[in-house]
Amino acid sequence: MALQAPEGLKRTLPRLADDLRRRGYSVIISGDPCYGACDLDLAARDRADILIHIGHTPVDNTERVIYEPWLVDGDLTVITRVIPHLREKKVGLVTTIQHIHLLQKAVRILRDAGIEPVIKGPFARTPCPGQVLGCSFDAAKTTKTAEIIFLGTGLFHPIGIQIATQARVLACDPITGRIEQPDADRLLRIRYGLIEKARSAQSYGIIVSSKTGQNRRALAEYLAHLSDKAQLIIMREVTPDQLLNLGFACYVNTACPRLAYDDQVRFPVPLLTPGEFEILCGVREFDQYEVDEIV
Protein backbone atom coordinates (compact mmCIF):
# COMPACT_ATOMS: atom_id res chain seq x y z
CA MET A 1 0.00 0.00 0.00
CA ALA A 2 1.00 3.63 -0.52
CA LEU A 3 0.73 6.30 2.20
CA GLN A 4 0.12 10.00 1.57
CA ALA A 5 -0.35 12.92 3.95
CA PRO A 6 -0.26 16.74 3.74
CA GLU A 7 2.87 18.60 4.80
CA GLY A 8 1.89 19.03 8.44
CA LEU A 9 1.34 15.29 8.91
CA LYS A 10 4.18 13.83 6.85
CA ARG A 11 6.30 13.01 9.91
CA THR A 12 3.63 10.57 11.07
CA LEU A 13 4.12 8.43 7.96
CA PRO A 14 7.37 6.59 8.87
CA ARG A 15 5.89 5.45 12.18
CA LEU A 16 2.67 4.37 10.46
CA ALA A 17 4.66 2.55 7.77
CA ASP A 18 6.65 0.67 10.43
CA ASP A 19 3.42 -0.40 12.13
CA LEU A 20 1.93 -1.63 8.85
CA ARG A 21 5.09 -3.57 7.95
CA ARG A 22 4.94 -5.35 11.29
CA ARG A 23 1.43 -6.41 10.30
CA GLY A 24 2.73 -7.91 7.08
CA TYR A 25 2.07 -5.11 4.56
CA SER A 26 4.49 -3.79 1.98
CA VAL A 27 4.49 0.01 2.20
CA ILE A 28 5.68 2.91 0.05
CA ILE A 29 5.53 6.51 1.32
CA SER A 30 4.63 9.40 -0.98
CA GLY A 31 7.23 12.12 -0.41
CA ASP A 32 5.87 14.67 -2.87
CA PRO A 33 4.08 17.81 -1.64
CA CYS A 34 0.40 17.33 -0.85
CA TYR A 35 -2.14 20.09 -0.25
CA GLY A 36 -5.41 18.21 0.06
CA ALA A 37 -7.62 15.41 -1.19
CA CYS A 38 -7.55 17.20 -4.56
CA ASP A 39 -3.84 16.37 -4.77
CA LEU A 40 -3.68 12.57 -4.79
CA ASP A 41 -0.39 10.87 -5.64
CA LEU A 42 -1.70 8.54 -8.32
CA ALA A 43 1.82 7.51 -9.32
CA ALA A 44 2.35 6.12 -5.81
CA ARG A 45 -1.07 4.47 -5.90
CA ASP A 46 -0.26 2.79 -9.20
CA ARG A 47 2.84 1.23 -7.61
CA ALA A 48 0.66 -0.30 -4.91
CA ASP A 49 -2.71 -1.96 -4.52
CA ILE A 50 -4.22 1.02 -2.71
CA LEU A 51 -3.43 4.58 -1.60
CA ILE A 52 -4.22 5.59 1.98
CA HIS A 53 -4.69 9.35 2.08
CA ILE A 54 -4.47 10.79 5.59
CA GLY A 55 -5.95 14.08 6.75
CA HIS A 56 -8.87 14.68 4.40
CA THR A 57 -12.18 13.39 3.10
CA PRO A 58 -12.80 12.59 -0.60
CA VAL A 59 -13.61 15.32 -3.13
CA ASP A 60 -14.20 12.89 -6.01
CA ASN A 61 -14.58 9.17 -6.73
CA THR A 62 -10.99 8.23 -7.53
CA GLU A 63 -10.60 4.46 -7.35
CA ARG A 64 -8.33 2.53 -4.97
CA VAL A 65 -8.05 5.34 -2.43
CA ILE A 66 -8.93 5.12 1.26
CA TYR A 67 -9.34 8.42 3.13
CA GLU A 68 -8.53 8.68 6.83
CA PRO A 69 -9.33 12.11 8.35
CA TRP A 70 -7.02 13.47 11.05
CA LEU A 71 -9.13 14.75 13.93
CA VAL A 72 -7.84 17.45 16.29
CA ASP A 73 -9.42 18.12 19.68
CA GLY A 74 -9.92 21.62 21.01
CA ASP A 75 -11.36 23.72 23.82
CA LEU A 76 -15.03 24.48 23.18
CA THR A 77 -15.25 27.15 25.85
CA VAL A 78 -14.61 29.40 22.84
CA ILE A 79 -18.20 28.63 21.76
CA THR A 80 -19.51 29.61 25.20
CA ARG A 81 -17.55 32.86 25.02
CA VAL A 82 -18.81 33.79 21.55
CA ILE A 83 -22.49 33.63 22.59
CA PRO A 84 -22.62 37.20 24.04
CA HIS A 85 -21.28 38.48 20.69
CA LEU A 86 -24.08 36.92 18.64
CA ARG A 87 -26.83 39.16 17.27
CA GLU A 88 -29.11 36.40 15.99
CA LYS A 89 -30.97 33.53 17.63
CA LYS A 90 -30.40 31.35 14.55
CA VAL A 91 -26.83 30.93 13.30
CA GLY A 92 -24.99 28.81 10.77
CA LEU A 93 -22.30 26.51 12.15
CA VAL A 94 -19.41 25.21 10.04
CA THR A 95 -15.94 23.77 10.53
CA THR A 96 -13.10 21.98 8.77
CA ILE A 97 -12.64 18.21 8.79
CA GLN A 98 -10.05 18.43 11.61
CA HIS A 99 -12.71 19.59 14.07
CA ILE A 100 -15.80 17.94 12.58
CA HIS A 101 -16.18 15.69 15.64
CA LEU A 102 -16.61 18.78 17.85
CA LEU A 103 -19.69 20.09 16.04
CA GLN A 104 -22.33 18.22 18.02
CA LYS A 105 -20.89 19.39 21.32
CA ALA A 106 -20.91 22.94 19.95
CA VAL A 107 -24.56 22.43 18.98
CA ARG A 108 -25.46 21.47 22.54
CA ILE A 109 -23.66 24.49 23.99
CA LEU A 110 -25.50 26.85 21.65
CA ARG A 111 -28.91 25.26 22.20
CA ASP A 112 -28.47 25.42 25.97
CA ALA A 113 -28.02 29.17 25.53
CA GLY A 114 -31.17 29.52 23.40
CA ILE A 115 -29.33 29.70 20.07
CA GLU A 116 -30.47 27.46 17.19
CA PRO A 117 -27.48 26.30 15.11
CA VAL A 118 -28.01 25.40 11.44
CA ILE A 119 -25.77 22.70 9.96
CA LYS A 120 -26.07 21.76 6.28
CA GLY A 121 -24.66 18.99 4.13
CA PRO A 122 -23.30 16.70 2.92
CA PHE A 123 -22.27 18.05 -0.50
CA ALA A 124 -20.24 16.75 -3.44
CA ARG A 125 -16.83 17.87 -2.14
CA THR A 126 -17.68 17.91 1.57
CA PRO A 127 -19.20 14.59 2.70
CA CYS A 128 -19.62 15.61 6.36
CA PRO A 129 -22.48 17.94 7.41
CA GLY A 130 -21.13 21.35 8.37
CA GLN A 131 -17.80 20.79 6.60
CA VAL A 132 -16.17 23.53 4.54
CA LEU A 133 -13.04 23.51 2.41
CA GLY A 134 -10.91 26.40 1.23
CA CYS A 135 -12.47 25.78 -2.20
CA SER A 136 -16.02 24.88 -1.17
CA PHE A 137 -18.39 26.84 1.07
CA ASP A 138 -21.67 25.05 0.29
CA ALA A 139 -22.23 24.16 3.96
CA ALA A 140 -22.11 27.87 4.82
CA LYS A 141 -24.09 29.22 1.85
CA THR A 142 -27.01 26.86 2.33
CA THR A 143 -27.57 27.81 5.99
CA LYS A 144 -29.27 30.99 4.70
CA THR A 145 -28.47 32.66 8.02
CA ALA A 146 -27.41 36.25 8.67
CA GLU A 147 -24.71 35.08 11.07
CA ILE A 148 -22.29 32.14 10.85
CA ILE A 149 -19.91 30.64 13.39
CA PHE A 150 -16.74 29.10 11.96
CA LEU A 151 -15.09 26.65 14.36
CA GLY A 152 -11.48 26.30 13.30
CA THR A 153 -8.08 27.90 12.92
CA GLY A 154 -7.00 30.78 10.70
CA LEU A 155 -8.94 33.44 8.83
CA PHE A 156 -8.85 32.14 5.25
CA HIS A 157 -12.01 30.06 5.60
CA PRO A 158 -13.95 32.77 7.51
CA ILE A 159 -13.07 35.41 4.89
CA GLY A 160 -14.18 33.07 2.10
CA ILE A 161 -17.41 32.35 3.98
CA GLN A 162 -18.07 36.07 4.42
CA ILE A 163 -17.62 36.79 0.70
CA ALA A 164 -19.62 33.71 -0.33
CA THR A 165 -22.57 34.40 2.00
CA GLN A 166 -22.50 38.13 2.84
CA ALA A 167 -23.21 36.98 6.41
CA ARG A 168 -21.61 38.25 9.60
CA VAL A 169 -18.94 35.65 10.42
CA LEU A 170 -17.40 34.94 13.81
CA ALA A 171 -14.27 32.79 13.74
CA CYS A 172 -13.84 30.70 16.91
CA ASP A 173 -10.43 29.05 17.24
CA PRO A 174 -10.62 25.98 19.53
CA ILE A 175 -6.82 25.79 19.73
CA THR A 176 -5.90 29.37 20.70
CA GLY A 177 -9.30 30.37 22.10
CA ARG A 178 -9.38 33.50 19.95
CA ILE A 179 -12.62 34.96 18.61
CA GLU A 180 -12.27 37.13 15.50
CA GLN A 181 -14.45 38.80 12.93
CA PRO A 182 -12.75 38.58 9.52
CA ASP A 183 -12.19 41.64 7.34
CA ALA A 184 -13.14 40.63 3.81
CA ASP A 185 -13.05 44.26 2.64
CA ARG A 186 -9.26 44.37 2.94
CA LEU A 187 -8.92 41.29 0.73
CA LEU A 188 -11.35 42.73 -1.83
CA ARG A 189 -9.36 45.98 -2.02
CA ILE A 190 -6.20 43.98 -2.71
CA ARG A 191 -7.94 41.89 -5.36
CA TYR A 192 -9.38 44.99 -7.04
CA GLY A 193 -5.87 46.47 -7.23
CA LEU A 194 -4.58 43.32 -8.91
CA ILE A 195 -7.37 43.40 -11.49
CA GLU A 196 -6.50 46.99 -12.34
CA LYS A 197 -2.80 46.17 -12.56
CA ALA A 198 -3.58 43.26 -14.90
CA ARG A 199 -5.48 45.48 -17.37
CA SER A 200 -2.22 46.59 -18.98
CA ALA A 201 -0.93 43.03 -19.46
CA GLN A 202 -0.13 42.03 -23.02
CA SER A 203 -0.41 38.30 -22.33
CA TYR A 204 -2.50 36.08 -20.04
CA GLY A 205 -1.62 32.54 -19.06
CA ILE A 206 -4.71 30.48 -18.15
CA ILE A 207 -3.51 27.79 -15.73
CA VAL A 208 -5.08 24.31 -15.92
CA SER A 209 -4.15 21.88 -13.15
CA SER A 210 -3.27 18.28 -13.96
CA LYS A 211 -4.22 17.25 -10.39
CA THR A 212 -7.29 15.03 -10.19
CA GLY A 213 -9.34 17.23 -7.87
CA GLN A 214 -8.32 20.60 -9.31
CA ASN A 215 -8.74 20.12 -13.05
CA ARG A 216 -11.21 22.68 -14.42
CA ARG A 217 -10.36 22.37 -18.11
CA ALA A 218 -13.78 23.49 -19.38
CA LEU A 219 -13.63 26.64 -17.26
CA ALA A 220 -10.09 27.38 -18.46
CA GLU A 221 -11.12 27.01 -22.11
CA TYR A 222 -14.06 29.37 -21.55
CA LEU A 223 -11.75 31.96 -19.97
CA ALA A 224 -9.22 31.66 -22.80
CA HIS A 225 -11.95 32.61 -25.27
CA LEU A 226 -12.56 35.89 -23.44
CA SER A 227 -9.28 37.39 -24.69
CA ASP A 228 -7.20 36.92 -27.81
CA LYS A 229 -4.14 37.49 -25.61
CA ALA A 230 -4.81 34.37 -23.51
CA GLN A 231 -3.08 30.98 -23.74
CA LEU A 232 -3.80 27.73 -21.89
CA ILE A 233 -1.04 26.29 -19.69
CA ILE A 234 -1.22 22.87 -18.02
CA MET A 235 0.75 22.52 -14.78
CA ARG A 236 0.95 20.21 -11.78
CA GLU A 237 2.75 22.50 -9.31
CA VAL A 238 2.26 26.26 -9.64
CA THR A 239 5.41 27.95 -8.32
CA PRO A 240 6.86 31.47 -8.64
CA ASP A 241 9.85 30.17 -10.62
CA GLN A 242 7.63 28.37 -13.13
CA LEU A 243 5.49 31.45 -13.71
CA LEU A 244 8.56 33.65 -14.03
CA ASN A 245 10.13 31.29 -16.57
CA LEU A 246 6.95 31.16 -18.68
CA GLY A 247 7.00 34.93 -18.96
CA PHE A 248 3.30 35.85 -19.08
CA ALA A 249 2.40 39.31 -17.77
CA CYS A 250 -0.59 37.94 -15.85
CA TYR A 251 -1.93 34.51 -14.95
CA VAL A 252 -5.46 33.25 -14.35
CA ASN A 253 -5.70 30.37 -11.91
CA THR A 254 -8.19 27.52 -12.36
CA ALA A 255 -6.18 25.22 -10.06
CA CYS A 256 -6.47 25.43 -6.26
CA PRO A 257 -8.31 28.69 -5.43
CA ARG A 258 -6.05 29.27 -2.42
CA LEU A 259 -3.09 29.96 -4.72
CA ALA A 260 -4.48 33.34 -5.75
CA TYR A 261 -5.71 34.32 -2.29
CA ASP A 262 -2.98 32.95 -0.01
CA ASP A 263 0.12 33.03 -2.19
CA GLN A 264 -0.18 36.14 -4.37
CA VAL A 265 2.71 37.84 -2.54
CA ARG A 266 4.99 35.01 -3.72
CA PHE A 267 4.19 35.46 -7.40
CA PRO A 268 5.98 37.96 -9.68
CA VAL A 269 2.83 39.13 -11.54
CA PRO A 270 -0.93 39.20 -10.86
CA LEU A 271 -2.54 35.79 -10.38
CA LEU A 272 -6.27 36.29 -10.92
CA THR A 273 -9.22 34.06 -10.09
CA PRO A 274 -11.63 33.10 -12.90
CA GLY A 275 -14.21 35.61 -11.68
CA GLU A 276 -11.61 38.38 -11.53
CA PHE A 277 -10.62 37.69 -15.13
CA GLU A 278 -14.30 37.98 -16.08
CA ILE A 279 -14.35 41.40 -14.39
CA LEU A 280 -11.22 42.41 -16.30
CA CYS A 281 -12.80 41.28 -19.59
CA GLY A 282 -16.07 43.11 -18.86
CA VAL A 283 -18.17 39.96 -18.44
CA ARG A 284 -19.18 40.94 -14.89
CA GLU A 285 -19.01 43.99 -12.63
CA PHE A 286 -16.88 44.17 -9.50
CA ASP A 287 -19.99 44.40 -7.32
CA GLN A 288 -20.78 40.88 -8.61
CA TYR A 289 -17.53 39.57 -7.10
CA GLU A 290 -17.65 35.92 -6.01
CA VAL A 291 -15.08 33.93 -4.09
CA ASP A 292 -13.52 31.24 -6.28
CA GLU A 293 -14.78 27.73 -5.51
CA ILE A 294 -14.44 24.34 -7.18
CA VAL A 295 -17.92 22.91 -7.70
Ranges and model annotations:
Residues 155-230, 237-245:
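Redox- and metal-dependent alpha/beta enzyme cores, enriched for Fe-S-associated oxidoreductases
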Residues 29-31, 121, 234-237, 273-275:
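Short loop/edge segments at beta-strand edges and connector loops
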Residues 50-51, 55-63, 141-159, 199-213, ...:
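Extended, charge-rich low-complexity interaction segments
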